[in-house]
Structure formats: C-alpha cells, structure tokens
C-alpha cells in the first residue's frame, strides 16, 4: 500500500512540526517541564530526587533524534517508528499515572500557558498521533509533484497544526477548570 505524496508529505511535515515544537517547548520552559517530570515520577512511586534532569536531557535528545530522522526522506521509516514509539511511551506514562490517580499534574503539552490535568482523552490523542506517525513509514506513491501539490501540502500542514493546537486548547479548557476545583 502506498499513499499519495500529498497525504504522506503532510503527515511527515506535521510530525516534524510536532517534535520541533515539543523540543522548543521543553527548552524554553525547562524548569516547568522538569516540574512536570517530577509529577510523573511520583506516579511511578520513584524517588524523583536527581532523576528529572537526566530524564529531561534524555527526552530532549530522543526528540531531537526523531526530528533529525523526520528531516530526511531516506529515514522516514525510522522516523515513523521512533516517533510512534515515543508517543506511545508518553501515553503509557500518562496511563500509569491515571491508573494511580495521579492526575493533578500537567500533561507537559501546553507551552506553560495553561495546565492540562491528565485525562483519558490525552491517551486517545497520543494514540492517534502515534498512528499518524506510523503512517509515515508507508511507501510514497511515485508521482510528480506540481505547484498546486506544493501549495496543497503547505495549506494541509498549516491546517493540521491549527487543528492540533485547537484540539489541545479545547482539551485544556475542560481540564483546567477541574484542576482549579481540585
């Protein structure tokens, strides 16, 4: 099975943007993200003292590797597999914290402007993102790209980014209110 180049290239560009923005978020808000990591570690009953900085560095390096793989067409299979795996690990970590009722921590995805309480909807979101990332491993339908294709690619990628941002904002609105109550 192969995908039309516009669909596949839009997915690749969107996954690239997702990981680039995730890296920027973590680097610009390093202290807040380390606080979030501390909350997640508590859900694992781990002694978080001293773990959050190495874990922070490991996550950033891993996301940089995904980003680097996403930038080159020849590494799209590795990019898709690793990106999907990272997103599923994040979902699994959220699931463990949800099961242990450690939900009053930020999910780590809000750019420091609003805090998302952990919720099963975030697991669904991450699984959907992982499936999209996995789709970039599919072979590209080898057809010539035209100017209209490139324009479509740009608009589709921007639309995907706007929809992702809007979806996160909608999720945060409901969860933020519950965090204030708790």
Predicted regions and their residues:
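Membrane-interfacial helix-loop segments of redox and metal-homeostasis proteins
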Residues: 1-182
């Amino acid at each position: 099975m192969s995908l039309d180049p516009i669909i596949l290239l839009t997915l690749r560009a969107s996954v690239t943007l997702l990981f680039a923005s995730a890296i920027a978020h973590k680097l610009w808000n390093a202290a807040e993200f380390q606080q979030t990591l501390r909350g997640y570690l508590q859900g694992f009953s781990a002694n978080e003292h001293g773990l959050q900085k190495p874990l922070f560095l490991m996550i950033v390096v891993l996301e940089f590797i995904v980003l680097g793989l996403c930038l080159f067409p020849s590494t799209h299979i590795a990019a898709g597999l690793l990106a999907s795996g990272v997103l599923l690990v994040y979902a699994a970590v959220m699931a463990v914290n949800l099961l242990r009722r450690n939900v009053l921590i930020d999910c780590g995805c809000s750019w420091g402007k609003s805090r998302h309480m952990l919720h099963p909807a975030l697991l669904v979101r991450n699984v959907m993102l992982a499936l999209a990332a996995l789709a970039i491993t599919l072979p590209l339908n080898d057809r010539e790209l035209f100017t209209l294709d490139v324009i479509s690619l740009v608009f589709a990628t921007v639309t995907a980014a706007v929809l992702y941002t809007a979806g996160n904002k909608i999720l945060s609105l409901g969860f933020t209110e519950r965090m204030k109550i708790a």
